[in-house]
C-alpha cells in the first residue's frame, strides 16, 4: 500500500442560514494512499461532493482538519493552499469545464503555464499526455469540435499533466453514455496504475464503484468503509 497523500481527520461540515442548520458531514476520517482508486457512493444529499470539496481545499470544514501531503490546509494562507493544490491535486468534474476558446492542447498545457514551465516544455508534456488518453490526432481541436467522451478525456489529461499525487473526480462519467463512461473509467484506472496517482471518485454508479480498489459509502453524513 502506498504512502498517505491526502487525509481528513474528524471532518464536520454544517451549513447555517437563518433558522436553517444542517450538518452534512459528521466526524469523517479518511486516508487516501498513493495509487489507489477510491469510490465514494451514497444517496443524493449524503455529503459526497461536499467531502470531495473539503478534501480538495475548495471549502473549509466547520471542524476537523484536511492534510495534503502532510500539510494541514487550515494552517496555510489562501495562496499557499493554491500552490499545494496545483502541486499535488488534479480535478475532474461531470462537466469538463474546458476553456471553449482554447484547443485541447492549450487546455491541457494550462496548468503547466501556471507553473511557469517553458512554452516548449509545456507543449511537449501536454502533447504526451493527450497521446496517453488517445487524442494525439485531436490536439488542435476546440471543445466544441470534440465528442463528449473526447472532452472528458481532455479533462482527465489536464488533471494528470502535472503528475499530481491525487485526482479528485466528481461524477466524472455522469454525463456520458454507458460505453463512453466505461472507456473513460478504464482510462482512469490504467493511469492510476501506471503513474501511481490516487483517484478519489464520487459516483452514483455502483457498477463502476465496484471496480475501484476501495469503496466507501456516506450515510447521513457518516462514513461506512469497505462495504
Swiss-Prot record:
Enzyme class of the recorded protein, top EC level: translocase
Domain called ABC transporter: residue spans: 6-227
EC code: 7.6.2.-
CDD domains with a match to the protein in the record: ABC_MJ0796_LolCDE_FtsE
Entry GO terms, CC: plasma membrane
Presence of the UniProt keyword Membrane in the record: yes
UniProt subcellular location: Cell inner membrane
InterPro entries with a match to the protein in the record: AAA+_ATPase, ABC_transporter-like_ATP-bd, ABC_transporter-like_CS, ABC_transpr_LolD-like, LolD_lipo_ATP-bd, MacB-like_ATP-bd, P-loop_NTPase
One biological process term in Gene Ontology: protein localization to outer membrane
Residues that hold ATP according to the record: 42-49
Gene3D superfamilies: P-loop containing nucleotide triphosphate hydrolases
Record-linked SUPFAM superfamilies: P-loop containing nucleoside triphosphate hydrolases (SSF52540)
Source organism superkingdom: Bacteria
PROSITE patterns per the UniProt record, alphabetical: ABC_TRANSPORTER_1, ABC_TRANSPORTER_2, LOLD
Mode of membrane association: Peripheral membrane protein
Annotated GO MF terms: ATP binding; ATP hydrolysis activity; transmembrane transporter activity
UniProtKB keywords: ATP-binding, Cell inner membrane, Cell membrane, Membrane, Nucleotide-binding, Translocase, Transport
PANTHER family: IMPORT ATP-BINDING PROTEIN, LIPOPROTEIN-RELEASING SYSTEM ATP-BINDING PROTEIN LOLD
Family statement: Belongs to the ABC transporter superfamily. Lipoprotein translocase (TC 3.A.1.125) family.
Its job: Part of the ABC transporter complex LolCDE involved in the translocation of mature outer membrane-directed lipoproteins, from the inner membrane to the periplasmic chaperone, LolA. Responsible for the formation of the LolA-lipoprotein complex in an ATP-dependent manner.
Description of how the protein assembles with itself and partners: The complex is composed of two ATP-binding proteins (LolD) and two transmembrane proteins (LolC and LolE).
Protein name as annotated: Lipoprotein-releasing system ATP-binding protein LolD
Originating organism: Albidiferax ferrireducens (strain ATCC BAA-621 / DSM 15236 / T118)
Gene that produces this protein: lolD
Amino acid at each position: 500500500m502506498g504512502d498517505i497523500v491526502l487525509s481528513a481527520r474528524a471532518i464536520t461540515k454544517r451549513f447555517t442560514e437563518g433558522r436553517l442548520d444542517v450538518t452534512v458531514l459528521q466526524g469523517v476520517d479518511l486516508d487516501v494512499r498513493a495509487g489507489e482508486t477510491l469510490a465514494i457512493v451514497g444517496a443524493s444529499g449524503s455529503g459526497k461532493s461536499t467531502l470531495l470539496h473539503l478534501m480538495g481545499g475548495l471549502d473549509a470544514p466547520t471542524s476537523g482538519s484536511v492534510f495534503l501531503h502532510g500539510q494541514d490546509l487550515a494552517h496555510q494562507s489562501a495562496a499557499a493552499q493554491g500552490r499545494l493544490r496545483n502541486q499535488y491535486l488534479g480535478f475532474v468534474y461531470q462537466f469538463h469545464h474546458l476553456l471553449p476558446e482554447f484547443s485541447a492542447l492549450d487546455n491541457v498545457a494550462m496548468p503547466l503555464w501556471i507553473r511557469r514551465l517553458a512554452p516548449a516544455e509545456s507543449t511537449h508534456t501536454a502533447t504526451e499526455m493527450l497521446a496517453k488518453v488517445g487524442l494525439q490526432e485531436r490536439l488542435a481541436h476546440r471543445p466544441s469540435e470534440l465528442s463528449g467522451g473526447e472532452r472528458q478525456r481532455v479533462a482527465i489529461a489536464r488533471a494528470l499533466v502535472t503528475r499530481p499525487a491525487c485526482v479528485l473526480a466528481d461524477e466524472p462519467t455522469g454525463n456520458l453514455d454507458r460505453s463512453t463512461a466505461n472507456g473513460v473509467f478504464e482510462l482512469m484506472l490504467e493511469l492510476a496504475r501506471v503513474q501511481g496517482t490516487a483517484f478519489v471518485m464520487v459516483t452514483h454508479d455502483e457498477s463502476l464503484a465496484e471496480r475501484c480498489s476501495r469503496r466507501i459509502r456516506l450515510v447521513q453524513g457518516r462514513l461506512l468503509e469497505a462495504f
